[in-house]
Amino acid sequence: MRNIYYTFISLIIILCINGCSKKSTPTNIYESEEYKSLSKKDIIIGESIWATSCFRCHRYGTNGAIVSENKEYWDKAAQKGIDALFKSVWEGYKGENGVMPAKGFCNLCDENEIRKSVFYMFHLAKK
């Protein structure tokens, strides 16, 4: 009887670990509630940050940055989800084509402003 009990408990633990370890697929930015619920004010804030920081590289492809008009690239990037992209912008990273500086050189920006600037980039690409 004890063996059955321990076998049952072991099975439950294995099922729980398996169920908890599965990673969910990130939501495409364009399909996320956060993107869909952006207000006009959010877009304006994102645009102002883009115009003062992001524009420097993403308008002309400086330092290997992907230009904002490259719809194909941004559509593919949108599949990574906002959290992964936000982390890359917030912390900075070295990509295939160049380096993304932390916060995109907007050192005075807070997390909310950086997030809005990321959404604005996707807003631009979708136009």
Question: Model features per residue range: what roles?
Answer:
Residues 47-50, 127:
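Short sequence/structural segments immediately N-terminal
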Residues 2-40, 120-127:
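Post-cleavage N-terminal segment of exported redox proteins
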Residues 20, 54-57, 106-109:
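Disulfide-bonded cysteines in secreted/extracellular proteins and peptides
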